[in-house]
């Protein structure tokens, strides 16, 4: 994924790299009526977003940056490792159609939460594992879920569980990247319930 950084894509934003209190506030954007938000960080946000797009009851996904110190970062800023942002997928879901627990189960299945600041060949703090909650019930379920998952693996789970902070939507070409075809125009299905393997490519 860092190839975009090398090509200079996503670098049009002019970011003030000084720490900003704006970046530290709780995400107060409102989901659609009857829906809830949650945020997940599990490595490259392209493949994580596609996984959640396929979940019945998920009504919207967006990729972006959160948990950092600067206001309105660009992809290039985040890749520099100096802003402390994580690559995030913000998931909007209808709790009548999709349980939060099912979203957590998918989270654990789609990445290795025992590798610190790394998923596969993607290395950096922006690729860290994280669950970012919007209410006490989400926090409770997330922590219980982590405890259960820890019992299933030999190495220490390094996933952080924190309140969801301000969400900075990523540049448009990152949104639904794999379903739009990615770099090579190879579109991948977003059909609800689809189990096709997800191929993440720049």
UniProtKB/Swiss-Prot annotation:
Principal localisation: cytoplasm
Keywords: Cytoplasm, Oxidoreductase, Phosphoprotein
Gene3D superfamilies: Peptide methionine sulphoxide reductase MsrA
Protein EC: 1.8.4.11
Compartments reported by the entry: Cytoplasm, Cytosol
Reaction it catalyzes: L-methionyl-[protein] + [thioredoxin]-disulfide + H2O = L-methionyl-(S)-S-oxide-[protein] + [thioredoxin]-dithiol; [thioredoxin]-disulfide + L-methionine + H2O = L-methionine (S)-S-oxide + [thioredoxin]-dithiol
Segments of this protein annotated with the region Disordered: 1-20
Phosphoserine modification, residue list: 189
GO cellular component: cytosol
Gene Ontology MF, one: L-methionine:thioredoxin-disulfide S-oxidoreductase activity
Superkingdom of the organism of origin: Eukaryota
Family assignment from sequence similarity: Belongs to the MsrA Met sulfoxide reductase family.
Name by which UniProt lists this protein: Peptide methionine sulfoxide reductase A1
Taxonomic lineage of the native organism: Eukaryota, Viridiplantae, Streptophyta, Embryophyta, Tracheophyta
């Amino acid at each position: 994924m860092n190839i975009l950084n090398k090509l200079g894509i996503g670098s049009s934003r002019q970011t003030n790299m000084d720490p900003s209190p704006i970046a530290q506030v709780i995400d107060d954007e409102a989901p659609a009526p009857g829906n809830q938000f949650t945020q997940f960080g599990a490595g490259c946000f392209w493949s994580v977003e596609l996984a959640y797009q396929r979940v019945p009851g998920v009504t919207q996904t967006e990729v972006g940056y959160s948990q950092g110190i600067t206001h309105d970062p660009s992809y290039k800023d985040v890749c520099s490792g100096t802003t402390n942002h994580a690559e995030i997928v913000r998931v909007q879901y209808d709790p009548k159609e999709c349980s939060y627990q099912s979203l957590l189960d998918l989270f654990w299945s789609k990445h290795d939460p025992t590798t610190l600041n790394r998923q596969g060949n993607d290395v950096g703090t922006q690729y860290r594992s994280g669950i970012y909650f919007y209410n006490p019930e989400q926090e409770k379920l997330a922590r219980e879920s982590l405890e259960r998952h820890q019992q299933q693996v030999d190495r220490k789970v390094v996933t952080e569980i924190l309140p969801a902070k301000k969400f900075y939507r990523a540049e448009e070409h990152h949104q639904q990247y794999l379903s739009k075809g990615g770099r090579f125009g190879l579109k991948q299905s977003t059909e609800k319930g689809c189990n096709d393997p997800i191929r993440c490519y720049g």
